[in-house]
C-alpha cells in the first residue's frame, strides 16, 4: 500500500530499511519452496505480515513517494544480496539488491560503526551520492575514475552467462571478508554502472561493545 509509507512523513536525514532479522524468503519458504504455515518473527506467529523480498518492496514503495530522500538498507537480507547473487527461490542470478531496491547505500554486516558515520555525513550536509568512503558500506556510481585501490569482480553479464565466472567472483569476495586486510571490490553493470563494496567495518572494541 503506497499510502502506508506516508504515515512516517519525510525524515530529516533518510530512511533506514531492513527486512528483519532473517531473510524474508527464508522466513517464508522451506528448502523445498513450500510456504511456511507460521512466521516465528511476527506476534502470534501470523504469516503474511511481510512481503516476499521485503527490502525491495519497502524501498520501492518509499522511492515512489519520496523521490530524493536517502534510503539506506541493512540487515541480513541486504547484506547477503549486496552484490550479484544466485537467488534460490527464482533459480536465477540477480543483480545487487542496491539496484533492484532503488536504495542509495547498504550498511553491510554489523553496522554499529557505519550507521553512525552515515548519519554524521548526512547531518553535515553531504549528499548521499558522495558517501563513498565508509567501511562496511556498499554504494553505486557511474564514475569509474573515482573507484581506487579496488579489485574488479567479473561483470554482472559475465556471471549471468558463466557459472565459472560467478565462482571466481564468489571466491574473491570470500577472500576479502577480513576487515584488517580486505580490499575494496566492485562489479560492473552494462559497462556503465558500478556497485562498490568497501572493506568491512572494523570490529568493535570492548568499550564500544559495552556501550551497545
Name each model-derived stretch.
Residues 2-190, 197:
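Glycine-rich beta-alpha loop elements in corrinoid/cobalamin-binding modules
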Amino acid at each position: 500500500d503506497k499510502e502506508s509509507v506516508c504515515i512516517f512523513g519525510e525524515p530529516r536525514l533518510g530512511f533506514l530499511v531492513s527486512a528483519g532479522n532473517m531473510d524474508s524468503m527464508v522466513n517464508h519458504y522451506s528448502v523445498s519452496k513450500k510456504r511456511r504455515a507460521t512466521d516465528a518473527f511476527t506476534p502470534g506467529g501470523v504469516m503474511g505480515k511481510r512481503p516476499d523480498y521485503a527490502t525491495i518492496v519497502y524501498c520501492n514503495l518509499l522511492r515512489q513517494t519520496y523521490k530524493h530522500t536517502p534510503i539506506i538498507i541493512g540487515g541480513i537480507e541486504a547484506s547477503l544480496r549486496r552484490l550479484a547473487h544466485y537467488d534460490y527461490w527464482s533459480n536465477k542470478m540477480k543483480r545487487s539488491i542496491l539496484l533492484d531496491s532503488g536504495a542509495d547505500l547498504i550498511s553491510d554486516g554489523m553496522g554499529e560503526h557505519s550507521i553512525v558515520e552515515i548519519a554524521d555525513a548526512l547531518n553535515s550536509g553531504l549528499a548521499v551520492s558522495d558517501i563513498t568512503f565508509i567501511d562496511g558500506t556498499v554504494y553505486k556510481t557511474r564514475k569509474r575514475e573515482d573507484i581506487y585501490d579496488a579489485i574488479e569482480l567479473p561483470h554482472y553479464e559475465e556471471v549471468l552467462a558463466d557459472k565459472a565466472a560467478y565462482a571466481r567472483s564468489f571466491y574473491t569476495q570470500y577472500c576479502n571478508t577480513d576487515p584488517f586486510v580486505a580490499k575494496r571490490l566492485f562489479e560492473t553493470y552494462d559497462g556503465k554502472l558500478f556497485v562498490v563494496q568497501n572493506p568491512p567495518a572494523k570490529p568493535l572494541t570492548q568499550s564500544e561493545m559495552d556501550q551497545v
